[in-house]
């Protein structure tokens, strides 16, 4: 209990009273052992005086051996008593005191280095008790604490507990006098309608995007008109070819957009008509247009929107297109590409002849 009290108080390792008690006990034990040895020596001397010379020498040797055994027994008893006292005192130490002592000692590497330094300086490893080690470690911890408190805190840089923790900054750091009164405008970013949330927000409907970007059709028409005017004014053949190519691609694009718009109008009218029939009870199931029927209705709507002259020209172009398609599907014998006597075969080298 003495050692635990001292560790908890953090003043001393062992009080002076216990040391005096231990010293008195050891002294009394040594005196009693000396008296026993003296008594045994007197007995041996009496017995040896009565015998002859040979017996005297044997008795003397026996006495010396007995004295050595007694001394060894005394040393063993003293060491056992000391170890028992230390173990009893250590068993009464509280866990809190042990934890404080261990925290104040520092890492094991420092302990080992200090132990090696002590052994190298002395040249011999003295058999120190665990209490002496605890006392030395407590002294070292106090010295380290005293040295750490003496250092100035300004030299220590603020460090974070981990890399994810926020940065620590002193409150004495002066604040800058510069203030942002007016924030500069943000840099303009290009907007792509394919990925614009304003366009894609309405559940992916293309009608919203078309209505929002309907002005692009006007731009395309104006661009096509401008290219046609340039083509009429230019005389460079290369520039003319480039303008013709651009005009052709622009007209194809406008034609495709117009055809898609007609298809959507035809589908919307058909769905509306079918819904009205179902509502009136004339139909139970709606009729869905096939691609061929949709194509016919779109073509009919296209011709209805044209004028008389445009309609005639469009029909003539369509007729030429159909005849060319039929001629391609016709076999080679019926196309008039060779004489009847020399029929056309894959291995022959006859030339093709155009029909007038």
UniProtKB/Swiss-Prot annotation:
Ranges annotated as biased composition (Acidic residues): 57-84
Gene Ontology biological-process annotations: maturation of SSU-rRNA from tricistronic rRNA transcript (SSU-rRNA, 5.8S rRNA, LSU-rRNA)
Highest taxon of source: Eukaryota
One Pfam family linked to the record: RRP36
Encoding gene per record: rrp36
Keyword Calcium: no
Ranges in coiled-coil conformation: 238-279
Protein name: rRNA biogenesis protein rrp36
Basic and acidic residues composition bias: residue spans: 132-159, 313-337
Covalent S-S links between cysteines: none
Organism: Neosartorya fischeri (strain ATCC 1020 / DSM 3700 / CBS 544.65 / FGSC A1164 / JCM 1740 / NRRL 181 / WB 181)
Gene Ontology CC terms, in alphabetical order: 90S preribosome; nucleolus
Described purpose of this protein according to its UniProt entry: Component of the 90S pre-ribosome involved in the maturation of rRNAs. Required for early cleavages of the pre-RNAs in the 40S ribosomal subunit maturation pathway.
């Amino acid at each position: 209990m003495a050692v635990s009290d001292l560790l908890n108080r953090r003043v001393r390792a062992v009080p002076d009273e216990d040391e005096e008690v231990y010293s008195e006990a050891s002294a009394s034990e040594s005196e009693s052992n000396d008296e026993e040895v003296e008594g045994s020596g007197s007995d041996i001397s009496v017995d040896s005086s009565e015998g002859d010379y040979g017996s005297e020498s044997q008795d003397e040797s026996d006495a010396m051996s007995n004295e050595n055994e007694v001394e060894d027994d005394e040393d063993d008893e003293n060491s056992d008593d000391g170890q028992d006292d230390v173990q009893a005192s250590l068993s009464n130490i509280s866990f809190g005191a042990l934890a404080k002592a261990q925290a104040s000692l520092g890492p094991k590497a420092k302990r080992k280095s200090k132990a090696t330094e002590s052994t190298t300086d002395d040249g011999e490893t003295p058999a120190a008790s665990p209490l002496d080690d605890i006392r030395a470690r407590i002294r070292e911890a106090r010295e380290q604490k005293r040295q750490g408190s003496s250092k100035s805190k300004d030299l220590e840089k603020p460090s974070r507990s981990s890399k994810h923790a926020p940065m620590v900054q002193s409150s004495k750091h002066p604040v800058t006098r510069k203030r942002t009164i007016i924030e500069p405008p943000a840099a303009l970013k290009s907007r792509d309608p394919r990925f614009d949330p304003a366009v894609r927000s309405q559940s992916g409907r293309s009608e919203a995007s078309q209505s929002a970007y309907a002005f692009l059709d006007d731009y395309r028409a104006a661009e096509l008109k401008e290219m046609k005017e340039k083509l009429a004014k230019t005389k460079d053949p290369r520039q003319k070819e480039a303008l013709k190519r651009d005009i052709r691609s622009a007209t194809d694009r406008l034609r495709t957009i117009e055809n898609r718009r007609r298809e959507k109008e035809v589908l919307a009218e058909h769905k509306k008509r079918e819904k009205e029939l179902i509502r009136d009870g004339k139909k139970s199931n709606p009729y869905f247009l096939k691609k061929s029927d949709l194509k016919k209705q779109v073509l009919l709507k296209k011709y209805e929107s044209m004028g008389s002259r445009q309609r005639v020209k469009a029909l003539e172009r369509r007729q030429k297109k159909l005849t060319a398609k039929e001629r391609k599907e016709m076999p080679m014998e019926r196309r008039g590409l060779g004489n009847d006597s020399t029929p056309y075969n894959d291995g022959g080298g006859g030339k093709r002849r155009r029909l007038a």
